[in-house]
Amino acid sequence: MAREYARTDRVGQQIQKEIATILMREIKDPRLSMTTVSAVEVTRDLAYAKIFVTFFNDNQDEIKASLEVLAEAEGYIRSLLGKRLRARIMPHLRFVYDSSMSEGVRMSALVDQAVASDKNGDAEVDDTQVDDEPSVDSEKGE
């Protein structure tokens, strides 16, 4: 059972490597320039492969257009992949935008912003804590 999962992982890694090479060398569409294959998930029966791609540009319209180009070229990419891989079954390809990179950049920016606001806000918090302490003590006495 464990070997079956290892095989899908190996096939996925090989597909990732070959599709990255195909996109870089064989596909001449300018809308697909700077396309990166970030991951590949292959089903257990090797019938389907989900290819996660990222693009240099984060514009949503251009991402949709690039995904449409990849969907149209799926048959051609699959035939080139079939020539390069020695596999009995060549999986059907489905290209999906991998938003994890842009989400990671967004989260990092939010953390940096929070750290910067904490540094600026610490001095203000210290001043307010000193002013508020007598009123808290007077409330306890009542």
Swiss-Prot record:
**Source superkingdom:** Bacteria
List the SUPFAM superfamilies. Answer: Ribosome-binding factor A, RbfA
A Gene Ontology molecular-function term? ribosomal small subunit binding
Could you tell me the keywords of this UniProt record?
Cytoplasm, Ribosome biogenesis
- Report the GO terms under cellular component: cytosol
Q: Where in the cell is it found?
A: Cytoplasm
Function according to Swiss-Prot or TrEMBL: One of several proteins that assist in the late maturation steps of the functional core of the 30S ribosomal subunit. Associates with free 30S ribosomal subunits (but not with 30S subunits that are part of 70S ribosomes or polysomes). Required for efficient processing of 16S rRNA. May interact with the 5'-terminal helix region of 16S rRNA.
Assembly with partners or alone: Monomer. Binds 30S ribosomal subunits, but not 50S ribosomal subunits or 70S ribosomes.
Q: Which family does it belong to?
A: Belongs to the RbfA family.
Sorted alphabetically, which HAMAP family does this protein's record hold? Answer: RbfA (MF_00003)
Q: What is this protein called?
A: Ribosome-binding factor A
Q: Gene name on record?
A: rbfA
